Amino acid sequence: MMKILFVVLINLCSIGAFADNLKEMEKKMIDQDEQRPEVHESIAIASTETFSGTWPFKARYTDAPGFRMHYVDEGKGEDTLLLLHGEPTWGYLYRQQITSWKQYARVVAPDHMGFGKSATPSSRTYWLQDHIDNLESLVLSLDLNNITLVMHDFGGPVGMGLAARHPDRIKSIVAVNSPTPFGQPDIGERLSANVADSPWFQWIVNAESTGILEEVLGHLDFNILSTLKLNGFVDNSIINETWISAYRAPFPTPAFALGAIGWAKGFAVGKHQFEVPTAAAKNEIMKKPAMAIWGVQDHTLHANHFLPLFEAIFPSGEVHLISEAGHYSLEDSPEEITNLVIEFLRGQKSS
């Protein structure tokens, strides 16, 4: 069964000989399972796990959202960079940025419920509004203000949901290959058009209709690499055993994959509801500095479908296209994105 599940995703990837490398590397990782520490309760990764020093940040936790939510809190200052990951990643996606960005602001990087070092409670639902509620609880418990939202993938709808509820706490917006739904009338139309062009969303819809979605995503421990490749990154040289371990670690069993399953399933069955801002909140957010960064080779969230959403809310916002980056542009072009955000922050201080 595991082999079949893996082949399903590999065939969708259509990446030729690279599939053989995926099979080899993931088989090797599976063979190492006996060496992994036993997980306990509903958190898959030990608080002290650094993944061979690539994640050196102190683990912090809050129970404010009603479950044990992990976040890192680095640097100091009145301004806060709030880093929001997407599917099926965690704060590790920002590991190469945190060290640099914390020199300019306080950096808070939470893991959504069911991802990373956060808990995966079995009694909760994992729809968009749940993730917005959880993020809101974290922000209020830490009393974060002057927030620059840095959002990737579904971190965008979550972050924009926070912005709709608390526009006064938001200083600026950075969307990295991330939708920015904020009451635009054509959101549904653009989502539908994107599905027609996206192998990942086509797979989600088909997998749900054929009843295999939960089975496949429940085994991300085995097929994490092929799933990431289907969503899209360009630089295969980033792949090594530590990298694979970090991204597969949150999902040791199907019980720990509820977050990844929930995000995909919620899209397929229409459970994700975007936060709709009030007129006052929309007017306030539209005045904020904003920047969109997009890896052009993103075949999951296409720039031509989603950049117009950003430009509708932020007509004066900066837009940067990275030609040699895919959906996981933070992996493909980490230095370029790091520097773009630093310049963006400097620009706000000088204005």
Question: Where on the chain are the PLM-derived regions?
Answer:
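Positively charged n-region of N-terminal signal peptides that target proteins for export
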Residues: 1-5
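Flexible "cap/lid" subdomain of the alpha/beta-hydrolase fold that forms the substrate-access gate
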Residues: 21-59, 67-74, 80, 108, ...
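Conserved HGGG/HGGXW glycine-rich cap/lid loop of the alpha/beta-hydrolase fold
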Residues: 73-117
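Bacterial N-terminal signal peptides
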Residues: 7-14
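Short, hydrophobic alpha-helix immediately C-terminal to the catalytic nucleophile
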Residues: 95, 160-164, 338
